[in-house]
Swiss-Prot record:
It comes from Neisseria gonorrhoeae. The chain crosses the membrane at residues 183-203, 220-240, 280-300, 322-342, 347-367, 396-416. Signal peptide: none annotated. GO terms for biological process: establishment of competence for transformation. It is found in: Cell inner membrane. This is Competence protein ComA. Essential for natural transformation. Could be a transporter involved in DNA uptake. The gene is comA. To B.subtilis ComEC, H.influenzae REC2, and E.coli YcaI.
Length: 691
């Protein structure tokens, strides 16, 4: 008990230390900073993003992730005097998806910011150092593809050698996810372990050729493996995940230095070493997956002394697949059905062919060698992209905690020897986990979820048997939050997908959401989407709930915002109104055309709470109880604006904001409207929800 209390106290102490080094103030513009670029900048086409050690005017130091939308050059090691808009790391909060606060805390990111127009160079950067070396390697890889014919292959080589994930275009990441291969292109424990094994194997071969063996050959082999792991981790930028991987391997090597040791004892020692070095590792999904899968391998393979290597490999792949069924299903709400088979082939190919070629081409920048590696990488990616297009995914709804615990137990039972007779029960429990469905919405009622889409919009409307999604949010929001949350909500089919208008914060996630089967696409600008129909005035009813597309009177010279679809949903007398980015002129046109029929208890404010929408006349006509502003935390547009907030409150309307509360839920029915946050709890280190 004393050890447990000491460990808990140590974890709290380290967490408080990490929190104290984060930017705690709200968004502040024009902050004078002296920054040193500490890692290779990465570009996504819109901006250049780089990690920097920043010192403010008070002498306080922060590790910031800065963005420059002017896309200027920021040499590694250079120091600058800049002004920036800085704010804490606060991400979206949905049913499932990336937790940016946990990611920032576990990776040592103290805040994010946007660089201003002016900058003064204080120091041009040194010509040596790991970061500079990595930058040169990346440049050498780019120069190896003079004609640009192997751009994707070169990008993969850069990702595998120096950890430059931004070298891969976004479309490739979307291909890796349904195949369950994202872990292969972001340097992690798998890569570091494979390089360690490669170095250890080379050391063993060299020692075998030596006329005189050292006193402790095992120690030399283990030391070579650890040295290889450290070398690769440094080459990849020595990020926090790679640091943990090196430490884990060092712990394994230390445990094995004197001969055979219990696999479980080694596992526990490695886990203790990682948590002692960095207690915040528990916030990273990778830690749970890494140690969980290794534990599954030990559980399945330990004690089977008489099996051949092939049988052991098959059993190991089976164990990893079974436990992944539970872990991936719960964490990501999705199961790539072809993942076990694809991983069985891809892991050896990436580990023993592509990664060694990437390392060799980095150390020996010989153009033909680099081009050969890039050629293999290019056609590997082309095959995987094709495979991703034809590979299905299985959505897994968010199961309650007791069912999750039972599913983990079932996975372990399934890995036990056949003679125990427990496998049929394990299969039944796992089937219950993957087929779980949340409680259905009652007839004549509607459940509305306004997802936390950052500076975007996405609204899910559910009835007893139907689902409608209004807008998809941005590309990033859809991939990291909305699609996983739709899966977790049990949405396997969208009966209607509505795209209010052609704007990246409303339809940017169309490609990601579009992979979910749908019964039809309706849009304010249907010409931009294949097979889409216009959201002209029409009414329909699902499960006793009335839906209606409203349309302003015809106007001339309407911009894209003015073409937004307008949706009204009525269930048992309670109503929801969503207007996309409709401006005040469009709102006034709706008032003139529909008058009091616009009355709705829940109004999603137009244009995220911009001054261009939510006029007083419109608020009077709608007369809502709740007004929802779907906007990003500390967004550059300051949505919802002070003017809109004051106008809403002056009408006696309760304002709810996704940037402060995360995703919001509303129940519409005969009892009126029930409103609540989707996530009502938070850990003590979390900022969001603020309210």
């Amino acid at each position: 008990m004393l050890c447990v209390l000491a460990g808990a106290a140590y974890g709290v102490f380290r967490t408080e230390a990490a929190l104290s080094s984060q930017w705690r103030a709200e968004a502040v513009s024009g902050v004078p900073l002296t920054v040193e670029v500490t890692d290779m900048p990465r570009s996504d086409g819109r901006r250049v993003q780089f990690a920097a050690k920043a010192v403010d005017s008070g002498g306080r130091t922060f590790d910031l992730l800065l963005s420059d939308y002017k896309r200027r050059e920021w040499a590694v090691g250079s120091r600058w005097r800049i002004t920036a808009r800085v704010h804490p790391v606060v991400g979206e909060l949905n049913l499932r998806g990336l937790n940016r606060e946990a990611w920032a805390l576990s990776n040592g990111v103290g805040g994010v910011g946007t660089v201003g127009a002016d900058r003064v160079l204080l120091h041009g950067g040194s010509g040596w150092g790991i970061a500079v070396w990595r930058s040169r390697i990346s440049r050498n890889w780019r120069q190896a593809d003079a004609d640009g014919g192997l751009s994707d292959g070169i990008g993969l080589m850069r990702a595998l050698s120096v950890g430059e994930q931004s070298a891969l275009r976004p479309g490739l990441w979307q291909a890796f996810r349904p195949l369950g291969l994202t872990h292969l292109v972001s340097i992690s424990g798998l890569h570091v372990t494979m390089v360690a094994v490669l170095f250890a194997w080379l050391a063993k071969r060299l020692l075998a050729c030596s006329p005189r063996l050292p006193a402790r050959p095992r120690a030399w082999v283990l030391a070579a493996g650890c040295a290889g792991a450290l070398f690769y981790a440094l080459l990849a930028g020595f990020s926090v995940p790679t640091q943990r991987s090196v430490l884990m391997l060092a712990a394994f090597a230390w445990a094995w230095r004197r001969g055979r040791l219990s696999a479980w004892a080694t596992w526990w020692q490695a886990l203790a070493a990682v948590l002692l070095f960095d207690p915040l590792a528990v916030l990273g999904v990778g830690t749970w997956l890494s140690f969980g899968l290794v534990a599954a391998l030990i559980w399945a393979c330990a004690g089977r002394l008489y099996e051949g290597k092939r049988q052991t490999a098959v059993r190991g792949q089976w164990a990893a697949s079974v436990l992944s069924l539970v872990l991936l299903g719960y964490l990501f709400a999705s199961l790539p059905l072809v993942s076990p088979l694809v991983n069985a082939v891809s892991i050896p190919w990436f580990s023993w062919v592509l990664t060694p070629l990437a390392l060799l081409g980095s150390v020996v920048p010989f153009a033909p060698l680099q081009q050969a590696g890039a050629f293999l990488a290019e056609y590997t990616l082309r095959f995987l992209v094709w495979l991703a297009d034809v590979s299905p995914e299985f959505a897994v709804a968010a199961a309650p905690l007791p069912l999750l615990v039972l599913a983990v137990c079932a996975a372990l039972l399934l890995l036990l020897p056949r003679g125990l007779g427990l496998r049929p029960w394990a299969v039944l429990l796992l089937a219950g986990f993957v087929s779980y469905r949340p409680e259905a919405v009652p007839e004549n009622e509607a459940a509305v979820t306004v997802w936390d889409a950052g500076q975007g919009l996405s609204v899910l409307v559910r009835t007893a048997n139907r689902h409608l999604l209004f807008d998809t949010g941005t590309v990033a929001a859809a991939q990291t939050g909305i699609v996983p949350s739709l899966n977790a909500a049990g949405v396997r089919r969208l009966d209607k997908l509505v795209l209010s208008h052609h704007d990246s914060d409303h339809d940017g996630g169309f490609q990601a959401v579009g992979k979910i089967p749908n019964g039809g696409i309706y849009a304010g600008q249907p010409e931009f989407y294949e097979g889409a129909r216009h959201c002209a005035e029409q009414r329909w009813q699902w499960d006793g709930v009335d839906f209606e597309f409203l349309r302003p009177s015809e106007r001339k010279n309407i911009d894209d915002n003015g073409k937004s679809c307008v949706l009204r949903v009525v269930a048992g007398g309670a109503a929801l109104l969503v207007t996309g980015d409709l401006d005040t002129k469009g709102e006034e046109s709706l008032v003139g055309k529909y008058g009091g029929n616009l009355y709705s208890q829940v109004l999603v404010l137009g244009h995220h709470g911009s001054n261009t929408s939510s006029s007083g006349v419109f608020l009077n006509a709608v007369s809502p109880e709740y007004a929802v502003a779907s906007s990003g935390y500390a967004n550059a547009y300051k949505h919802p604006t002070e003017a809109v907030q004051n106008r809403v409150r002056a009408h006696g309307i309760k304002l709810l904001r996704t940037d402060l509360s995360g995703a919001l839920q509303f129940g519409l029915g005969r009892g009126g409207v029930k409103a609540q946050r989707l996530r009502v709890y938070k850990f003590y280190w979390q900022k969001k929800p603020f309210e």
